[in-house]
């Protein structure tokens, strides 16, 4: 569902997929015609499966994977002057309880700030939170704060929640857990 949403923006694009796990966003970018895709994840096992998935889909020539900690890699890529047409941030839940929301906000702010720095002017950022405790307002505020910190303007292209097979039950707040944005990133002048 959300993986399909990025496809229309990936034709001929250079894509960075952070927290790729088994590569589903990266593979969808490759299928959509991205010129190159780099998927990054800290799990060696997940990266091995992602590489197999790329091979099974005939994408090994354009979609590659790296077993690295995203928080450590993004500053290195920035220092090297790397820029991407699209950066995808799909981290695991940074909080699974109300007591750790403050630390989660720091993590989401940092990862979004780093991701925005790597997007070419006019490129795209897809960013997600799969934590129920990181509600819509707080996630949105955190992204806006990251954008101010790096002096970029965000133009919201799309907002989604989880796919229809994970319905949101109004009587169960915890069922509204996924927030998924696509932004166009514009440098402020």
Where do the language-model regions lie?
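Conserved class I S-adenosyl-L-methionine
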Residues: 12-21
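Conserved SAM-binding loop of SAM-dependent methyltransferases across substrates and taxa
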Residues: 22-35
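Conserved SAM-binding motif I beta-strand of class I
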Residues: 36-41
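S-adenosyl-L-methionine
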Residues: 45-88
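Helix-to-beta-strand junctions that scaffold the AdoMet/dcAdoMet cofactor pocket
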Residues: 59, 119-121
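Mobile active-site "lid"/loop adjacent to the S-adenosyl-L-methionine
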Residues: 84-114
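C-terminal catalytic and target-recognition region of SAM-dependent MTase-like enzymes
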Residues: 110, 124-189
